Amino acid sequence: MKCYFDRKHLAQMRETLQVVRPKTDNLLLKYVAHQFVDSRAKEYAHHGFARRIQTLARCIENAFRIVPPGTVKIPSKNRLHDAQINIQAAIGNTYGCVDNLAWVWVHERGLANSIDRQQVGLRKHHKKMRETLSAELREYLDTLESWFGYLVDYRDAFAHRIPLYIPPGGVRPKDHERAKELEDRKTAALNALNPYEYERLDAEQMKLFVFQPLICHSFNEMPAPMAFHPQLIADFLTVEALGLKMLGELAAATAAHSH
C-alpha cells in the first residue's frame, strides 16, 4: 500500500515536529519575562495565549502519535476519533491564540474603551485596531489574510456548523465500480435481514479503501479536504511567528512611550 506523503515530505514533518516543543517553551519564557503594564493584558498573555500555545503543541504531538503521517492502513474508529478531538482542539486554540494576541495589544495600549469589541482583531476589516499597529506589522498581517480566512472557516464550522472529521478512507478510481457493487449487495443483505452476509461484504469492501490523512468539515461548503499533518505544523509556526512579532511590537511601543 502506498503512503499519502513521499519520503522527503515525511522527513521534513518529523524534523519540524521535533522543534514544536522547544519553540513553545521559548515563546512562553519570552511572554512570561515581558513586563506588562496592564493587568488584563498580562492575564490574556499568561493565561490566554501562553496556555493555548501549550495546548496547541500537545494537540499536534498527540495527532502525530495517534495517526502518524506514514499511516497506510485505515486506523480504528477510536484512533480516528481521538485524532479528530486533538485536531478540533488545535484549530480552536489556534484561533484563540490570534484572538488573545489582539486583546493583549488592546489592553496593554489602553485602547479597550476607544475600540469597539467587534473591531478587536488582526484582519484587514479590523480597521480601527490595525491603525494602531506599525506599518511593518500591518504589512506582515496582510500576508496572513488568506490563512486567517481558512482559520475562521474551520473554527466556525467546528463551533457552529459541521465538526471537523477524518474520512475513514477513499477508494481509488479503478476500484469505484467494485465498491459500488459491494455497497448495493450490502443494502440487499440488510433488506434480507442477513447480518452475516452484510459483515462479509463490508469486510470485502473495506479492502478497497485506502487511508488518506485528510480533514474536512462539510463536503458542500469546502473546496476539498486538507492534509492535516502539514497544516497543523504550518498553523503552529504561523502562531509562533505572530506571537514573536506581537512581542516585538509591544516592546517597541513601551520603548517609544518611555522616551
Language model features with spans:
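Acidic, Ser/Thr/Gly/Pro-rich intrinsically disordered interaction regions
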Residues: 1-88, 92, 100-259
